Each structure stands twice: as structure tokens, then as C-alpha cells.
Amino acid sequence: MATMLINHMLFLTSLLIVVFPVANAIPARDIDKLCKETTDVPFCLKYLGTDPRIPAARDLTDVLLIAITQSKMQVDDATTHIDRVRRKFNGPHGRRRIEVCKTNYGIASARFHTAWELGLQKSFWDVEKLARIGTNAVIDCENVWRRDGPIQTSPLTFYNMNVFKLSGIILLIFNKLVT
């Protein structure tokens, strides 16, 4: 009898662990609907809609945390890219611009990390503020390539635009959470 009870409890616990997150997951149609409210639907569907963590997301707070994580991943990838391309920019303007981007991506990384931590605490206004600061640092990295000297093509435009678009998604989710 005791063995049957233990087996039954293990089965129910396993069932709860496996089924509970899925049963309470945010429906995929809600993610599609959210993405349709963004300025770049295919981008949103690519980065949020296909994220393997989305099926386990219970609510918009979890989706917000995933979007912040996606931003942090883009920032980290850009930082790695900076290290790879830095030697291609040996002129004074290129070196200065790469250093501005390296510094700004350091700021963005720290801000998105803290935003994620505050998102866990549901401190949404602080999340919004930090996501803006991180995004503005990335935007400045894009803009520095057009300031103070000859215009150059930024080697980080891909990452800069991804962070900018993810920021729009973060702000959209933020607005839904606070209104």
C-alpha cells in the first residue's frame, strides 16, 4: 500500500511539473497578437515567437523577461563582434568610434542585466527606465559613426537594430503590464 501511495505521489508530482507550466502557459496566439502590434512583425515572430522559452511563459511578465534576455544576448554578441572587428579600424576616427561602442555596449549589458533582475521582482517602471538607458547607449553606438569626422558604416548596425527593435517590444509589453 505504501509503495502504491509513493508511486502515485511521484506520478502526480511528475504530472504537475510537466503539465502545469504548459497548462498555464501564455497561448501562442497571444504572442502572435503581441507581435502584430510591433513595428516589425517578422522580427518579433523570429525572436519571440520561436524562442524555446516562450511555450513555458506563464504570462506577459515572463515574455518581458524573455525579451530582455534576447536584448542582453544581442548586446553580448555585439561585444564579441567588436573584439573581432576592432583591428580593421586603425584610423583615429575608427578607433575612437569602436571604443565608444565598446563602452556603450558595456553600459547596455549592465542595464539589461539589472532590468532582468528587476523584472523578476515585477518592478516594471525600473525595467522600463533601464531598458531605455541600455537602448540609448546602443543607439549612440550607431550614431557615433556619423559624428565628428567622415561618415563611416557601423560594423554593428545589425546588433544595434536588433536591440532597438527588441526595445520596442519591451516597451510594448511594459505598457500592457502597467495599464
From Swiss-Prot:
UniProt xrefs under Pfam families: PMEI (PF04043)
Under Gene3D superfamilies, the record lists: Invertase/pectin methylesterase inhibitor family protein
Q: List the disulfide bonds.
A: 35-44, 101-141
CDD domains assigned? PMEI
Tissue expression from the record: Expressed in seeds, buds, and mature flowers.
Q: Give the subcellular location.
A: Secreted, Extracellular space, Apoplast
Please state the span of the N-terminal signal peptide per the UniProt entry: 1-25
GO cellular component terms attached to this protein's record? apoplast
GO BP terms, alphabetized: regulation of seed germination
Q: Name a GO molecular-function annotation.
A: pectinesterase inhibitor activity
Keyword Cell membrane, does the record have it?
no
| Main localization, broad class | secreted
Q: Which UniProt keywords apply?
A: Apoplast, Disulfide bond, Secreted, Signal
Question: What is known about what this protein does?
Answer: Pectin methylesterase (PME) inhibitor that targets PME from seeds and modulates PME activity and pectin methylesterification during seed germination.
Q: Which family does it belong to?
A: Belongs to the PMEI family.
Its name, as the record gives it, is Pectinesterase inhibitor 5
- Natural source organism: Arabidopsis thaliana (Mouse-ear cress)
Q: Report the gene name.
A: PMEI5
